[in-house]
């Protein structure tokens, strides 16, 4: 790996909050037993809050945000991974407590990582990212068991709120693919055609409902 690399660093000094892309070296990365060359990360709602002002989610500064990433193992002291393994990370408070994915290299606990499926490119994995993982987990809760979901047994009618957001959009796609009759709930009339194009059979516009 290079002697130095780029990372987005946030810092708080008194009332001053700043964000800056800086050159750092490996010694800056504090935690973990696996060093990853980061290919992609994504911008999640929690990331936006942290980038705005730390949102009380970050306790120590300076800090590298980014709650998910995909990439390739560069160095490993963890028996589960070896250099060259393609991995995905989402969650585990990475980007909050631990340094995150807005860096060309990340060092994390190997227990936080999973190997990337060969059916996805590194870029595709982060297009889905934390939002896709969350949507799939939410879809599990509509079934009796995870196995039923994977077998494709459908729930007849499902309402997805916040349907035009990252999690909601992917949930609409997943449930439509499984054969459910999806009703999407949104706050904007302009989202109607988009939601129908990704699989919603019905769209409820909350802005037109007066109670």
Residue ranges and their predicted role:
Residues 46-48:
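Cytochrome P450 core scaffold surrounding the K-helix E-X-X-R motif
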Residues 209-211:
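Conserved small/polar residues in nucleotide/adenosyl-binding loops
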Residues 25-43, 54-94, 100:
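Glycine-rich beta-strand-centered segment in the early N-terminal region that forms part
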Residues 112-122, 150-156:
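Glycine/charged-rich beta-loop-alpha catalytic/anionic-binding loops adjacent to active sites
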Residues 95-110:
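A structural motif shared across PLP-dependent enzymes of the aminotransferase-like
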Residues 126-207:
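Mid-domain Rossmann-like dinucleotide-binding core that forms the NAD(H)/NADP(H) cofactor-binding site
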Residues 6, 20, 37, 70-72, ...:
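Residues located in well-ordered beta-strands
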């Amino acid at each position: 790996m290079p002697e130095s690399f780029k990372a987005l660093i946030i810092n708080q000094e008194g009332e001053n909050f700043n964000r800056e892309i800086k050159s750092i070296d490996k010694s800056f990365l504090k935690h973990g037993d696996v060093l990853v060359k980061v290919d992609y990360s994504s911008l999640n709602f929690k990331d936006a809050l942290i980038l705005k002002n730390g949102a009380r989610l970050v306790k120590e500064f300076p800090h590298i945000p980014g709650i998910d990433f995909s990439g390739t193992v560069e160095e490993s002291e963890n028996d589960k991974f070896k250099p060259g393994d393609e991995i995905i990370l989402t969650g585990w408070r990475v980007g909050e407590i631990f340094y995150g994915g807005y860096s060309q290299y990340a060092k994390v606990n190997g227990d936080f990582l999973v190997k990337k499926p060969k059916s996805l490119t590194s870029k595709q994995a982060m297009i889905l990212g934390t939002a896709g993982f969350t949507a799939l987990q939410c879809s599990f809760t509509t079934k009796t068991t995870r196995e039923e979901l994977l077998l494709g047994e459908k729930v007849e009618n499902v309402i997805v709120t916040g349907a035009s957001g990252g999690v909601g959009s992917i949930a609409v796609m997943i449930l439509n693919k499984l054969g459910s009759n999806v009703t999407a709930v949104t706050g904007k009339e302009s989202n109607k055609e988009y939601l129908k194009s990704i699989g919603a059979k019905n769209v409820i516009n909350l802005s037109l409902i007066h109670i």
